[in-house]
Amino acid sequence: HCRLRRQRQMCIRDRYKNAQMTTSIRNITIIAHVDHGKTTLIDNLMKQSGSFRENEVVDERLMDSGELEKERGITILAKPASINWKDSRINIIDTPGHRDFAAEVERVLSMADGALLLIDSAEGVMPQTKFVLAKALKQGLKPIVVINKLDKADQRADEVLNETFDLFVSLDANEEQLDFPVIYASGRSGWASNEIDGPRENLNPLLDLVIDHVKPAEFDKSKPFAMLSTLLYADSFLGRSLVGRISQGTAKANQQIKAINLDGEKVDEGRSTKIFRYEGTKKVPIEVGEAGDIVVIAGLEKANVADTICDTEVDTPIQATPIDPPTMSIKITVNSSPLAGTEGKKLT
């Protein structure tokens, strides 16, 4: 047992060592209307890119890990994953498609260098498509349009492409954004093609398009470490875990760090007890996280979303994108009316 455990640990270390030698990182988010196939597409991207062992049992909709997500069949929380393709690592962020969870989409766009805009080839442009695309364009992202579910009998890919172009124009996209690449796919069947009637073999054309079209952002690794906290997870062992893209410098395990809010006030200070990176859907521990990568940091119990996690010598917070205020707010308090307690017993 000990020998097998040591061999397994050596294999894992070799994997991580090789992963750290990747030449570039692409951070992309997948945005779409609800039920247009984001999570199913990611499932097949992970399987075809070799993220799982041959003998590993893989669930459907593996990104939907929450009980409520599995029960409802929808994505509620944004979640990162990672795949290695050729000489690059692609961090993929799955986002909710339902408008009730739109704030999740807004937050994760700040971590992305590019976006895949998925559109159902039969349903076409839907209300949430417009919302998420507007947010992506405002961030300056240049989306790749994926016309999905092309295996449907009632697909109308050409019309949907025209609808999509009209949507870009109506949202005041610039010339670079209007010159968006298009690829046709079936996430469920696991293929993508540059032409409607092109070969339908695998998802390699989509991964190649991501590498060619999404340029990795440039970061200064010589500056002190700083990262905008974008997602927050609770861990029964490590406590509060903060997810974000490192904006500058490098994050190291057991490094003295602090959290500052948008006003530059210190919220918390401590040591980064653990640093993780995503390999597939799993979190794997690393010693050093570099600028541009999406990492998970544990060790700060008071830090929150939109706080800047940084080296102790950093004083300037990273500006977070303001999230749209709620359409309606409700305040529930104790009934302090003079007539409180005088209601009748029969309530119906």
Regions found by a protein language model. Name each.
Residues H1-D14:
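Single conserved hydrophobic/aromatic residue that forms the stacking wall/gate
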Residues R13-T348:
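Structural and coupling elements of P-loop NTPases
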